Structures are given as structure tokens and as C-alpha cells.
């Protein structure tokens, strides 16, 4: 390959100016570097991806069968939840704010009822003490 690439710029150098074959040769170098870097990154990615399942498999094998299946389920739930989240919050927040208002009103009413009962009991007790 090296002999061919060296002969090509020489043939180009005779009819054309010297600048073109040099840039062409440089372009070739950059391409080869890109290819090498890409192949390296791919190999790194493939290595890391091959390492990941091994690391996940080994702890589950050591711990036993019961903890093994549970983490993937949790992850699946997380992914499902994250997919559903973007559509939910708008409707959920609206309904939740309405529910909050209603609940606050109900809670206030309940408190008022409790207070009135307590006051009534106190009055009865105080009146009962007076009579006794």
C-alpha cells in the first residue's frame, strides 16, 4: 500500500503543481487517522459493552438468583416511567392542583367541625362542673 500511495503523488506531481499532491497526500493521512481513530473508538466501545454484561452477570451469580432478576425489573420500570413522564406532568399537575384546592377546603371544614365539637364538649364539661 505504501509504495502505491507514494507512486500516485509522483505521477500527479509531473502534470500538476506540487501543492495538489501534497494536499492530496495529507488528506489521505487524515483519512487514515480518522479511520484508525474510529476503529479504536469502536473497539473501545465494543470492549466496554462486552465488559458491562460480564460485570452485571458476575455479581448476580455471586449474590444468588433472587437479587438477580429484581434489578432489571427496576430498570425497566424506570425506563417506562421516564417515557410516560413527559405526557403526564401537564395533566397530572392540573388535576393535582385542583385536588389540592378541594382537599384544602375539605380539611378546613373538618378542622372547623372538630373545633366546634371540642368547644361543645368543653362547654358541657364546664357547665357540668358548675352544676356539680
From Swiss-Prot:
The lineage of its organism: Eukaryota, Metazoa, Chordata, Craniata, Vertebrata. Disulfide bonds: none annotated. Belongs to the nuclear transition protein 2 family. It holds the Pfam family TP2. This is Nuclear transition protein 2. GO terms for cellular component: nucleolus; nucleosome. InterPro entries: TP2. Residues 1-20, 82-94 have a biased composition (Polar residues). One of its GO terms (biological process) is positive regulation of protein processing. The modification Phosphoserine is found at residue 127. A motif (Nuclear localization signal) lies at residues 105-113. Zn(2+) binds at residues 12, 16, 24, 29, 31, 35. Plays a key role in the replacement of histones to protamine in the elongating spermatids of mammals. In condensing spermatids, loaded onto the nucleosomes, where it promotes the recruitment and processing of protamines, which are responsible for histone eviction.
Amino acid at each position: 500500500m505504501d509504495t502505491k500511495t507514494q507512486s500516485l503523488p509522483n505521477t500527479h506531481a509531473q502534470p500538476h503543481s506540487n501543492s495538489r499532491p501534497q494536499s492530496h497526500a495529507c488528506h489521505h493521512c487524515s483519512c487514515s487517522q480518522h479511520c484508525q481513530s474510529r476503529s479504536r473508538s469502536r473497539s473501545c466501545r465494543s470492549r466496554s459493552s462486552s465488559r458491562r454484561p460480564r460485570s452485571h452477570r458476575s455479581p448476580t451469580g455471586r449474590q444468588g438468583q433472587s437479587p438477580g432478576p429484581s434489578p432489571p425489573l427496576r430498570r425497566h420500570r424506570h425506563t417506562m416511567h421516564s417515557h410516560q413522564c413527559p405526557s403526564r406532568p401537564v395533566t397530572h399537575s392540573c388535576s393535582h392542583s385542583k385536588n389540592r384546592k378541594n382537599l384544602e377546603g375539605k380539611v378546613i371544614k373538618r378542622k372547623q367541625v372538630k373545633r366546634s365539637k371540642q368547644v361543645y364538649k368543653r362547654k358541657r364539661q364546664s357547665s357540668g362542673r358548675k352544676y356539680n
